[in-house]
């Protein structure tokens, strides 16, 4: 070994193509597809994958974590309350107690999504960025997977047909947009699905409604995180994230209960 790096262009391309082909062949038929790699989606992915179920997370942007990175108005911290702090501690995330507030903790807004994403990956989940879910597969009155497209192709406005991923269950964890549910409602008006959207901010109400609003809203389709509050007209919360993590965990537990029967 003379210390010279090998960098053959063709070998690089072949390596990427072979690896990508094998990856796609492994994930075109899975147990759960999670749409959106924000706080609730990553949490759900971690708990589902830990139990050995094939889980794929699809994120339109090139980074995961949703709005966590920006903290509160760009300040690099978020707030988490008990008992959601246990979910972050499991991922090795450092938490600081808030003086005078026994139930509240602050966490670094960069460390949280980074470590939570790694925890989901280490558990066995596959996270794909730059992929947008443009439609759902609807068979015999049940969601049976997702229709996917490159986000770059969508942004360019090119008319190129999509591909699909089959799944037993789909989770909409796309945040305020609730985009998967919106798509189902828009394309299938006969189903009578409506998405009223979230209400204005009331942090305590919003936090406490998140787990209650986390549920299966159509056969095979679950909502968690802010998508759950958007679907059920719940309040928004701001830079407090405990409800998001608890919602993701509850969503995973609900699906696990069905799949483990």
UniProtKB/Swiss-Prot annotation:
Catalytic activity reported: hydrogen sulfide + glycine + NAD(+) = ADP-5-ethyl-4-methylthiazole-2-carboxylate + nicotinamide + 3 H2O + H(+)
Its EC number(s): 2.4.2.59
Biological process according to GO: thiamine biosynthetic process; thiamine diphosphate biosynthetic process; thiazole biosynthetic process
Binding, NAD(+): 40, 59-60, 67, 133, 159-161, 179, 226
Annotated residues for binding of Fe cation: 161, 176
Binding site for glycine: 236
Pathway info: Cofactor biosynthesis; thiamine diphosphate biosynthesis
Cofactor: Fe(2+)
Molecular function (Gene Ontology), one example: iron ion binding
UniProtKB keywords: Iron, Metal-binding, NAD, Thiamine biosynthesis, Transferase
InterPro entries per UniProt: FAD/NAD-bd_sf (IPR036188), Thi4_fam (IPR002922), Thi4_prok (IPR022828)
HAMAP family for the chain: Thi4
Record note on quaternary structure: Homooctamer; tetramer of dimers.
Function, in words: Involved in the biosynthesis of the thiazole moiety of thiamine. Catalyzes the conversion of NAD and glycine to adenosine diphosphate 5-(2-hydroxyethyl)-4-methylthiazole-2-carboxylate (ADT), an adenylated thiazole intermediate, using free sulfide as a source of sulfur.
Family statement drawn from the similarity comment of this UniProt entry: Belongs to the THI4 family.
Name this polypeptide is given: Thiamine thiazole synthase
Organism for this UniProt entry: Methanococcus maripaludis (strain C6 / ATCC BAA-1332)
Gene (name only): thi4
